[in-house]
Amino acid sequence: MGLKAWNGVVLAAVASIWLASGTQREKPILSEQQSLRVRALETQVAENPSDPNAVKNLAQAYLDARVPGLALNVVESAPASVRREPIIDHLYARALLDQGRAVDALAAEQRVLDACEPGMDGTSRCDTWLLASATRRADILRQLVELGVEDANAHPEMSAVAYHNATREARLAVR
């Protein structure tokens, strides 16, 4: 095969690679319906970044859309007063867990539990749902960390063991 033939083969290969790479479009992160909802929530956060409810709704929308990295960014870029809210820390812990950072998620969930402890008057600043959810997730995260699992998604069988260990019931037989 002559030099011209080899040049033709190489040029044809390069052209086919170029055509194949140029025809695929990037997939959107959010669906059309989710993007409309998220756009409205992003506008609310941009207008009032110190509103914990707006930050919570936006971070939750990102978690629902399975983009925990964006949820982390929303929480980490929020003012410190917002980040200290227990519900925001609870969402932050979930985003950290979804990102494969179990140790950091456990620390965030422990901050939620510390913030939800009853004060001297016996009242808590957290509702019962948040307290129950944070307690359950902290138990599961503690088991994950004890088993040495940093990324629960990468080790589903160990995650199942941790979940089972954290949620099993203890029965007491009284005779």
Where are these regions (language model features)?
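Alpha-solenoid helical repeat scaffolds
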Residues: 53-57, 86-91, 107, 121-131
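Terminal, low-structured helical/coil segments at or just beyond the last alpha-helical repeat
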Residues: 121-175
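TPR-repeat structural position
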Residues: 31-34, 68, 102
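Long, contiguous interaction/recruitment modules in multidomain scaffold/adaptor proteins
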Residues: 1-40, 174
